[in-house]
């Protein structure tokens, strides 16, 4: 018996260095994957779900913090984590991460970090449907970035956010000017991932005018074709969601001219809703359900719309959303006070 125990102890001691080596080598591989996600502008893929992205980021960021506090990737990885929290429905954690980003960047007066922190604040406002404040935060982020360079390569990412916020506010002429700026930038600095999401914004702009003329919807179809072309070359699961979601919006708009398209839109929304129903707090599930409710409403399907509305907007959710807005307001107020000092 003692001999067996001794053998086990020897084996255990021998395994410790090997286990340490495995842990040490695994972290760089995970970090490389997260950095690859940054380049692709995705939050998950077919093999790495959103929960893994969050878990890896939470473990890796404290390790790389010491030597990377003034590194762009360090803050972009934090933004990626904040967006992953938001997508999963953990809004409070996303706000906490935005606060941490701002405090770290402010401590070292790192302007890129302050810019990205303001973007994270804007993203939190966006998910809380506070479009005015989201736009203000994105513009603050752009102002901070312009202190570094008005030609900074990250500028186009903020322009995409600003365009989206302007469209949500109904300021379509301003959004169109931003989209033109984005298009010019992409001609000089081609990037397939940014091009994919730029086509989403251009498609959304055309779809928002679809009730005026079918010509706008023809434009939207061209942008969807561009998205599909990129997706076929780079078949990311993250892109697939956005392609289907934007296509459903196109079908919904086409339904104003031919109601048969509403059935196509509902089919796509239902397909996406079933895929993401495992977490009904996720941003994707809520977006899809909101669009489905609207589509039921314009089709006169009041009961179906009401049932989904009750599921999505419970009293607890409303009170929680108000709490989120207060959290974000406090964080943005801190930035505004710092600007006055």
Language-model segments: which ranges?
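Residue register of alpha-helical TPR repeats
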Residues: 35-36, 76, 116, 155-157, ...
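Structural signature of alpha-solenoid helical repeat junctions
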Residues: 70-73, 113, 153-154, 194, ...
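Amphipathic alpha-helical segments of tetratricopeptide repeats
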Residues: 58-65, 99-106, 140-146, 180-190, ...
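Hydrophobic positions within repeat-based interaction scaffolds
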Residues: 31-35, 51, 263, 273, ...
